[in-house]
Amino acid sequence: DLEIVKLDWDSLVPAVQSGKVDCVIAGQSITSERQQMVDFTEPYYYASIITLVKSDGDYADAKSVADLKGVTCTSQQNTIWYDSCLPQIEDANILPAQESAPAMLVALESGKCDAVVTDMPTGMAACVAYPDFKLLDFSGTDGDFEVSDEDINIGISVQKGNTELLDALNSVLDKMTEDDYKEMMDEAISVQPLSE
């Protein structure tokens, strides 16, 4: 039987390590730091990094990271978005990290900041929930955030050494196409509430 458990972002890895959950499917990047604590499937998604701004804000016409110079910004704590991407913005006023994706979106909506950096699925869902947001996607251009594949490859985490579950998950993932992943992601974005 499948049981879905809602956890805070910082609880995901400990929940897998302790056996509270068998696996985590939550947009986790397969970083070397996380791989020291849990095992990962092959990547099932590559999440491009995007920026959200208000559609009527000062940065709505930005075409590159350079165009965000001086922006007041934030993102979710313990993510590549906050730790690596925000510091790439010249003269950025980086606010403290937010505890969750919903919290960073509220910071943007309330005017505490002019931009948040996140991944494409979160950004797409945010634009549904907040129609006054604009998604800026610099991926594939020279003006994009500099990130490695490790930073954006998304996998399912399992307890270290649980090869039986890891092999079973990889077996299913191996049969899926890029179109399958896109369809599932689009559906998940359409039904995922952006609330705490």
Predicted regions and their residues:
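Proline/Glycine/Serine-rich low-complexity intrinsically disordered segments
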Residues: 1-196
